[in-house]
């Protein structure tokens, strides 16, 4: 996957740390560091820190904490797809056939967006239909119009993934620690 250089808090600057970008606060958009911080990340997507670079003493406009340059990679999304689309390596159009169940990725992927299935993890039922539990990458940025109704909050902007994806995905919860927070 593509590597991105961005900024995270000192506490998050650990190789292996995972976080999800939920939204971008207005204060961030006005910050001089925006283009090298949250401006490089996509709301609704999850990332893992793969490299920590030397700090340059940058401070966050919101938290006042030190921001550290890191290299991140987008992590695959775990969700449900119809069985006929669940083939490893295939690129398909996400149609939002499974909307409303715990494993549905509708708050991270937009209807009509192209996705690439990377791994089939198992099977699940949603509203009486059989689906495959899959890991996939979205190939375009999600449309966040109506994001609040899709479960994407505007703050905090980054929250950790509590655990690696399991066979029955559950919604992520936001953290009370501000724009960024650590894994437990």
Curated annotation (Swiss-Prot):
List compositional bias (Low complexity) regions by residue number.
Answer: 146-161
Alphabetized Pfam families for the sequence: UPF0179
Q: Which InterPro entries match?
A: UPF0179
Ranges where the record places region Disordered: 146-184
PANTHER family the UniProt entry points to:
UPF0179 PROTEIN MJ1627
Check the record and name the HAMAP family matching this protein: UPF0179
Could you say which protein family the record assigns here? Answer: Belongs to the UPF0179 family.
Q: What is this protein called?
A: UPF0179 protein Pcal_2106
């Amino acid at each position: 996957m593509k590597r991105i250089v961005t900024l995270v808090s000192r506490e998050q600057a650990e190789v292996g740390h995972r976080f999800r970008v939920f939204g971008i606060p207005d204060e961030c958009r006005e910050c001089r560091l925006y283009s090298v911080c949250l401006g490089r990340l996509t709301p609704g997507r999850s990332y893992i820190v793969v490299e920590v670079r030397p700090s340059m003493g940058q401070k966050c406009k919101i938290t006042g904490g030190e921001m550290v340059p890191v290299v991140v990679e987008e992590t695959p999304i775990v969700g449900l797809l119809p069985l006929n689309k669940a083939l490893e390596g295939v690129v398909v159009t996400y149609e939002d056939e499974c909307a409303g169940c715990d494993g549905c990725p509708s708050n991270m992927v937009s209807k009509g967006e192209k996705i690439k299935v990377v791994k089939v993890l198992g099977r699940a039922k949603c509203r009486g239909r059989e689906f495959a539990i899959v890991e996939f990458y979205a190939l375009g940025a999600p449309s966040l119009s109506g994001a609040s109704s899709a479960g994407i909050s505007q703050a905090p902007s980054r929250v950790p993934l509590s655990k690696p994806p399991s066979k029955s995905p559950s919604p992520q919860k936001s953290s009370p620690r501000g724009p960024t927070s650590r894994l437990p």
